[in-house]
Amino acid sequence: MPVQNMTGESPLERQVWLYRELYGLPCRASGPRITLSTSDVSAINAPSGLAALIDDELFWSKKVTPILDEGTGSGDLILLAAPSPLDMSCCAADLRRRARFEFLPPGRQIALPSTLPPPGPEPHWFRYPQSERLQPITAVLRAIRIVLRDIPRTYPA
């Protein structure tokens, strides 16, 4: 039986509630993990150095969005954005070619940090969703374009 607090909910249920209600992340409990499906959000895998610069750009434009480190040691971070009906295939090919960005395909399950230690790699927030909500994918793409324009010598095409 899961541990429950005074309100009758488990710490995992409480964390899911925080992610869903306060931060707008459409996640769910899946065993000991909290997962988020890329069918419900737009997710872009980016090299950590570029993701940090994109985070700075989003911060200065007041469009902060959650950024996740899956804890796999790959050196990549996942930028989360609101889902979009736009076709990103043209944009995705250009970003993959220029700077190793990858739009994660629909249906992939992403593990979010939770109160229970998960089996395997432990995800953690690079940018914790404190008051920020998922930003539109267009805001994230705008920040990516600005960063790539400003540092072409660091990440050549």
Where are these regions (language model features)?
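Extracellular structured ligand-interaction cores
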Residues: V41, S74-D76, G107-Q109
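DNA replication initiation modules
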Residues: D87-A157
